[in-house]
């Protein structure tokens, strides 16, 4: 039986797993990593994706690997792309 649980966005994970436990607002995070607050707000609200530059800044600030946020974002994109795309299942490996 397949469970269709909604996949979190990278912005939700950034907020819930990194910002909230450390009591960091979007304003404070933007100031600390030297990016516009709108960039952080857009990521949190799923209006934009994490760029390489922002990923590197977030990684440095939160003490994770350089690719952590980009890898997470790409994993989420792949999982969401697979949902409901039956034609992918019809492709045969060579």
Q: What are the residue ranges of the model-derived segments?
A:
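A short, Lys/Arg-rich alpha-helix, primarily the initiator
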Residues: 1-24, 71
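The alpha-helix within a helix-turn-helix
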Residues: 19, 30, 59
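Short alpha-helical DNA-recognition segment
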Residues: 23-42
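The DNA-recognition helices of helix-turn-helix-type DNA-binding domains
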Residues: 36, 47, 62, 73-76
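Residue-level recognition of specific faces of alpha-helices
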Residues: 39-42, 60, 68-71
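Short, basic-rich loop-to-helix N-cap that marks the start of a DNA-contacting helix
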Residues: 47-60
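Short, charged recognition helix plus adjacent turn
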Residues: 70-94
